UniProtKB/Swiss-Prot annotation:
It comes from the Bacteria. GO terms for molecular function: ATP binding; magnesium ion binding; succinate-CoA ligase (ADP-forming) activity; succinate-CoA ligase (GDP-forming) activity. This is Succinate--CoA ligase [ADP-forming] subunit beta. Belongs to the succinate/malate CoA ligase beta subunit family. Succinyl-CoA synthetase functions in the citric acid cycle (TCA), coupling the hydrolysis of succinyl-CoA to the synthesis of either ATP or GTP and thus represents the only step of substrate-level phosphorylation in the TCA. The beta subunit provides nucleotide specificity of the enzyme and binds the substrate succinate, while the binding sites for coenzyme A and phosphate are found in the alpha subunit. GO terms for cellular component: cytosol; succinate-CoA ligase complex. The keyword Plastid does not apply. GO terms for biological process: succinyl-CoA metabolic process; tricarboxylic acid cycle. Its cofactor is Mg(2+). Pfam families: ATP-grasp_2, Ligase_CoA. Its EC number is 6.2.1.5. It catalyses: succinate + ATP + CoA = succinyl-CoA + ADP + phosphate; GTP + succinate + CoA = succinyl-CoA + GDP + phosphate. Disulfide bonds: none annotated.
Length: 388
């Protein structure tokens, strides 16, 4: 689960991580009121969406007067902000964060997250702050410092010192920095975070260490433990198809720009199916893993969700029947087709448990379905019919 920057900063403040003075605003009038309350200029007007790259997309502006706060708030609120993370469709901006400007001397990068490879918590830091950390890691990996923490032993002072010295901090800043790092570790572990990121973490000319930006992602599987965090969820920032799929415990991810819907059982098979669709000259419109033990109802709802996407020009169903028997899949597809109708070509490749019963159910259904002998054949057929 993702949250907005202003919500992340509320958690930072709760844990004693220094942040700029500021407040969220949901209207132009509220933005102007926050600017007036801050009392000094410049102030920063920032779009609040669940995506990075807001500055390059025109979603972050430095206002040097009350008139500019009004101008920028009017320009950003209600805009469709397109960044490298939103896809070409962009995101509608419904919230702003208005903050004080700071006398920045240096920008750093700092994050903490679980590392699956080592089963430890890792801090990542870099003097290349304010940049895309993936780009830094790819081009200049030597600029990234990593400090691993065994959760059994917990965070110790020497971990913070290792980061501070690696970032070449001035001695007078180390105490502030170390306190911040300890707080971020506690925040990450208390709330089952999958990522806590500050980019940039700024050093000011008056010797302060401040989280200028904030990003926190949470482990969805742990949200039952954190009812307070669930209240931060913004459904407007989530894909409506993904929200609908989650109601039926389906693993669905929308793929921008795709035209072939697909339903598969098993994450590995789903990813391989998406690759084969791409190789056949089409583009997958979604990732949908119905799971090994899906019911006919889940199959029905998965199929319905795929067909509800107007971008979908064809559907590929690729099932290897094990726990999910082929006859159960067939019944789910038939029920979904009866309820919502089939407006696009559908190619089905089935193998495994009760495959003959499944094929018989589909054959007797009267539905215009295209059978495929294997995955490659299925991908070629759906790509061909989708192209018309």
């Amino acid at each position: 689960m993702k949250i907005h920057e202003y919500q992340a900063k509320q958690l930072f403040q709760k844990y004693g991580v220094p942040i700029p003075r500021g407040k969220a605003a949901f209207t132009v009038e509220e933005a102007k009121a926050v600017g007036a309350e801050l009392g000094t200029f410049p102030v920063v007007v920032k779009a609040q969406i669940h995506a990075g790259g807001r500055g390059k997309g025109g979603g972050v502006k430095l206002a040097k007067s009350a008139a500019e706060v009004d101008q920028y708030a009017k320009g950003i609120l209600g805009m469709t902000l397109v960044t490298h993370q939103t896809g070409p469709e962009g995101r509608l901006v419904k919230k702003l964060l208005v903050e004080e400007g700071l006398p920045i001397e240096k920008e750093l990068y700092l994050s903490v997250l679980p590392d699956r490879g080592t089963s430890k918590i890792v801090f990542m830091a870099s003097e290349a702050g304010g940049m895309d950390i993936e780009e830094v890691a790819a081009k200049t990996p030597e600029k990234i410092i990593k400090v691993f923490i065994d959760p059994l032993l917990g965070f110790k002072g020497f971990h913070a010192n290792e980061l501070a010295y690696g970032l070449n901090l001035k001695p007078e800043l180390i105490k502030q920095f170390n306190a911040m790092v300890a707080a971020l570790y506690k925040l990450c572990t208390d709330y089952d975070c999958s990522l806590v990121e500050i980019n940039p973490l700024v050093l000011t000319s008056d010797n302060r260490v401040i989280a200028l930006d904030g990003k926190i992602n949470f482990d969805d599987n742990a949200m039952y433990r954190h009812k307070d965090i669930q209240e931060y969820r913004d459904l407007d920032e989530e894909d409506p198809f993904e929200i609908e799929a989650s109601k039926f415990e389906l693993n669905y991810i929308k793929m921008p720009g795709g035209n072939i819907g697909n339903m598969v059982n098993g994450a590995g098979l789903a990813m391989a199916t998406m690759d084969i669709i791409q190789q056949a000259g089409a583009a997958p419109a979604n990732f949908l893993d119905v799971g090994g033990g899906a019911s006919a109802e889940q199959v029905e709802n998965g199929f319905r969700i795929i067909l509800a996407d107007p971008a979908v020009k064809g559907v590929l169903i690729n099932i290897f029947g094990g726990i999910l028997r082929c006859d159960r899949l067939a019944n789910g597809v038939v029920e979904a087709a009866k309820k919502v109708g089939i407006r696009v070509p559908v190619v089905i490749r089935m193998e495994g448990t009760n495959v003959e019963q499944g094929r018989e159910i589909l054959a007797k259904s009267g539905l215009n379905l295209i059978n495929a002998k294997d995955v490659a054949d299925a991908a070629q057929k759906i790509a061909a019919v989708a192209k018309g």
